[in-house]
């Protein structure tokens, strides 16, 4: 497993490795203003960074190189360094929960609503009971008992010749199963409240199906019914009463529905869900008019993700004719007719970033939609509803001036998307590059008046990677680098003669000198590959994004992670 360890920059031995990347670039224009805070160097991880671990970008000037002319407007050769400093160099880099008064007011308002939403779970005992009846194991056990009960009933009906007599062993097992489901109903009534639980007609029918066979089992076990054999007209009536137990097949269907809910909660982890008015969706009101949610699915995926029919029902009921949906997934889609053709799609790869141009277009489009009617809202989703979704939502929070800084918007989104009553795991914007691009957008809004910054052309000269033990010693076949721009690979170290790789044992670093690298501009993605490192997202150990317009003084220091291999 490869994990990103935050707020720690000290070098480790054995399996704990500090990464430090150093890129040397050629510049063809002057540098813009400093880059806003945001986490940086990218690795693909399964865990989201804690908002308090967000760090800044430090810019330093490197020694100048000799001047060279090139085909791009006579750009002069300068050196840009991307690196990760040690702990002594990172003081004050961490983000310390930038909670402003306005943010506290917003969070407090939602906390009151959420408290009302879970008012029936406010006691410690209810929380414990809720965790039990909502657990996956409890649901699976219930399905198993229903199957067992139906199997025993069918076996009894097929192999028992008696019209009336029912074996005591079967009745005892049936009674035990019925008591379990009665206990299940009572616990759910205790947790959810009687009025709320029985407001669902299916719950009422399910309770009746449980209670009726339970009463029959009690009569058969504890009362003498032999006298009924002398009354022929009772035989068929009792036989029909036994067949009522077959209705428990419906209970199995009901249990399947509960199991689906459990699976969806298991997949969504501790993301804040909407559980009012008969809905249970991985969906969060970030503000009154901005919704973050996971992918609306159909078919088999709807078993563990938001069913698209339920999402449509929710939006049509809560915001009829006043919602617009944004699909940020490049890897999956659905028919826009589900949402009355009010769907916009932005193609962003999983765990990657939108382009700066896409962020500007998106925020302006949403702003126009919001301005058309005070009732208009947007529902934004990717696959899980936090990384790509959070990046775009945070950009709009800045564009609409709900928050002024990247740190505030990122922290706020994380607080809203995370349900801390279930777990403290952070469910905000995932990757360092996504955090960084929110910082870029803050500059676009405040320094460039919501317009793209001037294009800056750069050339890669060198990569330096520090302290990756066992990597780089095998030459070109061991460590590779790839550069992607405009969704095209513009450089790959696998091509012969376009770079040299040297492992400096004394300084414990790998030097990758690039010969005749391509001109880079706007949004650039850098991927690293090695046979000695595990592959994760994008089929590589780690990668990062940056925008050339925000590189200052040609030294771009990326904080801050250690890769820990276990």
From Swiss-Prot:
Membrane topology note: Multi-pass membrane protein
Gene field: TPTE2
Keywords for the protein's UniProt record, in alphabetical order: Endoplasmic reticulum, Golgi apparatus, Hydrolase, Lipid metabolism, Membrane, Transmembrane, Transmembrane helix
Keyword Transmembrane helix on entry: yes
Protein EC: 3.1.3.67
Key word Transmembrane helix present: yes
Family matches, as SUPFAM superfamilies: (Phosphotyrosine protein) phosphatases II, C2 domain (Calcium/lipid-binding domain, CaLB), Voltage-gated potassium channels
CDD domains linked to this entry: PTP_VSP_TPTE
Catalytic reaction annotation: a 1,2-diacyl-sn-glycero-3-phospho-(1D-myo-inositol-3,4,5-trisphosphate) + H2O = a 1,2-diacyl-sn-glycero-3-phospho-(1D-myo-inositol-4,5-bisphosphate) + phosphate
Active-site residues, as the UniProt record annotates them: 382 (phosphocysteine intermediate)
A GO biological process held by the record: lipid metabolic process
UniProt-listed PROSITE patterns: C2_TENSIN, PPASE_TENSIN
GO cellular component, one term: Golgi membrane
Name of the protein this chain belongs to: Phosphatidylinositol 3,4,5-trisphosphate 3-phosphatase TPTE2
Primary location class: endoplasmic reticulum
Annotated ranges, domain C2 tensin-type: 455-566
SMART domains linked: PTEN_C2
Annotated TM spans: 135-155, 173-193, 208-228, 234-254
Localisation per UniProt entry: Endoplasmic reticulum membrane; Golgi apparatus membrane
Species the sequence originates in: Macaca fascicularis
MF GO annotations: monoatomic ion channel activity; phosphatidylinositol-3,4,5-trisphosphate 3-phosphatase activity
Short name of one Pfam family: Tc-R-P
Function in brief: Acts as a lipid phosphatase, removing the phosphate in the D3 position of the inositol ring from phosphatidylinositol 3,4,5-trisphosphate.
Segments forming domain Phosphatase tensin-type: 272-448
């Amino acid at each position: 497993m490869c994990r990103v360890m935050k707020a720690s920059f000290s070098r480790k031995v054995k399996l704990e490795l500090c990464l430090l990347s150093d890129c040397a670039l050629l510049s063809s224009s002057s540098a813009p203003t400093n880059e806003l805070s945001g986490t940086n160097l990218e690795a693909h991880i399964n865990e989201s960074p804690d908002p308090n671990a967000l760090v800044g970008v430090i810019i330093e000037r490197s020694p100048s190189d000799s001047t060279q002319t090139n085909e791009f407007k006579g750009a002069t050769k300068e050196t840009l360094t991307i690196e990760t400093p040690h702990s002594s160099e990172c003081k004050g880099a961490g983000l310390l929960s930038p909670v402003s008064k306005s943010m506290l007011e917003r969070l407090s308002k939602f906390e009151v609503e959420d408290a009302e939403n879970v008012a029936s779970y406010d006691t410690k005992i209810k929380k414990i009971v809720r965790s039990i009846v909502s657990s996956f194991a409890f649901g699976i056990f219930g399905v198993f008992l229903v199957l067992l009960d139906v199997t025993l009933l069918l076996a009894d009906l097929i192999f028992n010749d008696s019209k009336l007599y029912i074996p005591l062993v079967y009745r005892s097992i049936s009674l035990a199963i019925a008591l379990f489901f009665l206990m299940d109903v009572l616990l759910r009534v205790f947790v959810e409240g009687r009025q709320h639980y029985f407001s669902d007609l299916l719950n009422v029918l399910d309770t009746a199906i449980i209670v009726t066979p339970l009463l029959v089992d009690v009569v058969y076990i504890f009362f003498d019914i032999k006298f009924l054999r002398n009354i022929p007209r009772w035989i068929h009536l009792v036989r029909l009463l036994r067949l009522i137990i077959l209705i428990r097949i419906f209970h199995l269907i009901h249990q399947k529905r509960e199991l689906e809910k459990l699976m969806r909660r298991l997949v969504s982890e501790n993301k804040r869900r909407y559980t009012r008015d008969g809905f249970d969706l991985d969906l969060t009101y970030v503000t009154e008019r901005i919704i973050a949610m996971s992918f609306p699915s159909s078919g088999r995926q709807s078993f563990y993700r938001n069913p698209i029919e339920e999402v449509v029902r929710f939006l049509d009921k809560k915001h009829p004719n006043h919602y617009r949906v944004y699909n940020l997934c490049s890897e999956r889609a659905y028919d826009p007719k589900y949402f009355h053709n009010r769907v916009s799609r932005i193609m962003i790869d999983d765990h990657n970033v939108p382009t700066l141009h896409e962020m500007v277009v998106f925020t302006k489009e949403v702003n126009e939609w919001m301005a058309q009617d005070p009732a208009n809202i947007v529902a934004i989703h990717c696959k899980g509803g936090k990384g790509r979704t959070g990046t775009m939502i945070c950009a709009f929070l800045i564009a609409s001036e709900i928050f002024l800084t990247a740190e505030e918007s990122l922290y706020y989104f994380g607080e809203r998307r995370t349900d801390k009553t279930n777990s403290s795991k952070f469910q905000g914007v995932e990757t360092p590059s996504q955090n960084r691009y929110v910082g870029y957008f803050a500059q676009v809004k405040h320094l460039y008046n919501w317009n793209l910054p001037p294009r800056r052309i750069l050339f890669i000269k060198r990569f330096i990677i520090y302290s990756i033990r066992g990597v780089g010693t095998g030459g070109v076949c061991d460590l590779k680098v790839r550069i992607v721009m405009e969704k095209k690979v513009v450089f790959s170290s696998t091509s012969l003669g376009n770079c040299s790789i040297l492992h400096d044992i004394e300084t414990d670093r790998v030097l990758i000198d690039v010969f005749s690298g391509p001109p880079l501009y706007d949004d650039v993605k850098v991927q690293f590959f090695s046979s000695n490192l595990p592959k994760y997202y994008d089929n590589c150990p780690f990668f990062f994004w940056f925008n050339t317009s925000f590189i200052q003084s040609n030294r771009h220091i990326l904080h801050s992670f250690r890769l820990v291999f276990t």
